[in-house]
From Swiss-Prot:
It comes from Mus musculus. Involved in epithelial-mesenchymal interactions in kidney and lung morphogenesis that include epithelial differentiation and branching morphogenesis. May be involved in the organogenesis of the spleen and heart and in cardiac and coronary artery development. May function in the development and sex differentiation of gonad via transcriptional regulation of AD4BP/SF-1. Residues 30-49, 70-80 have a biased composition (Polar residues). Expressed at high levels in lung, kidney, gut, heart, ovary and podocytes (visceral glomerular epithelial cells). Also found in spleen, large intestine, uterus, bladder and testis. Gene3D superfamilies: Helix-loop-helix DNA-binding domain. This is Transcription factor 21. GO terms for biological process: animal organ morphogenesis; branching involved in ureteric bud morphogenesis; branchiomeric skeletal muscle development; bronchiole development; diaphragm development; embryonic digestive tract morphogenesis; epithelial cell differentiation; gland development.
Length: 179
């Protein structure tokens, strides 16, 4: 999900540049290469590359004749793999940046705290649930709850923990995945 920030635009431009480079490589490929390399390319574009040879989508190899172009075909496959690897690295960089931005926007998480992606998502989810609870309760002090009145993990100070759990579980959107 995009936040609309400047860094999101930069990340998307980086991924698009890598995609354009791979398209140039694909358009320069000679005709006469095996169908296998084009099938691999289509799998990478769909975002669901097959893992190993024993996956659900087993395909029969069409009998191929050995030709002097096999060296060129191998080079084309290697270039295609390198382009796919570069796209995957760029995608992972974008994802890591998004998680680090999310971690820094969570209150009460020190910058040097090492959180897993799952912990970051859980904290963000509980923080959102807490904000929803505040809005639902509509118990503002002059229309505003100061952050000093909030305690870890995101509950209103002085409110019994059991009451908080009841409200959070009633408003939870994540279902069984939340703890």
């Amino acid at each position: 999900m995009s936040t609309g920030s400047l860094s999101d635009v930069e990340d998307l431009q980086e991924v698009e540049m890598l995609d354009c480079d791979s398209l140039k490589v694909d358009s320069n490929k000679e005709f006469g290469t095996s169908n296998e390399s084009t099938e691999e390319g289509s799998n990478c574009e769909n975002g669901s590359p097959q893992k190993g040879r024993g996956g659900l989508g087993k395909r029969r190899k069409a009998p191929t004749k050995k030709s002097p172009l096999s060296g060129v075909s191998q080079e084309g496959k290697q270039v295609q793999r390198n382009a796919a690897n570069a796209r995957e690295r760029a995608r992972m960089r974008v994802l890591s940046k998004a998680f680090s931005r999310l971690k820094t926007t969570l209150p009460w998480v020190p910058p040097d705290t090492k959180l897993s992606k799952l912990d970051t998502l859980r904290l963000a989810s509980s923080y959102i649930a807490h904000l929803r609870q505040i809005l639902a309760n509509d118990k503002y002090e002059n229309g505003y709850i100061h952050p000093v009145n909030l305690t870890w993990p995101f509950m209103v100070a002085g409110k019994p923990e059991n009451d908080l759990k009841e409200v959070v579980t009633a408003n939870r959107l994540c279902g069984t995945t939340a703890s």
